[in-house]
Amino acid sequence: MASLFRSYLPAIWLLLSQLLRESLAAELRGCGPRFGKHLLSYCPMPEKTFTTTPGGWLLESGRPKEMVSTSNNKDGQALGTTSEFIPNLSPELKKPLSEGQPSLKKIILSRKKRSGRHRFDPFCCEVICDDGTSVKLCT
């Protein structure tokens, strides 16, 4: 009897997960075609909004930022002027990162790989539509 139950358990689990996905899709369709425009969202973090994109959902955070120009030039002119004032700086350190210092490039890439793995935390939002229906979305 127990083996019969174990054989049906994966099928039951798949069926239930499919029903949950269908109900979530039905609730999202209930918000209407202008889902991204007519939407209030209540999230644990401030100023989170959902917008629709051709590729799917996009979670945006905060207000749009202004593009601020920095003192660095595209050609690396600022790096050249600062390294000229340091007399005992080796020529390898004066080169831009793209040309020299392959060991430093490896350190930076490995640090990005390590930090990228542990950054993902589950994030949930309750999305409230204009008609009062709500959907809980988790990443």
Swiss-Prot record:
GO terms for cellular component: extracellular space. GO terms for biological process: cell-cell signaling; positive regulation of chorionic trophoblast cell proliferation. The keyword Secreted applies. Residues 59-114 form a propeptide. Coiled coil: none annotated. Disulfide bonds join C31-C125, C43-C138, C124-C129. The keyword Secreted applies. Its main location: secreted. May play an important role in trophoblast development and in the regulation of bone formation. Belongs to the insulin family. This is Early placenta insulin-like peptide. It comes from Homo sapiens.
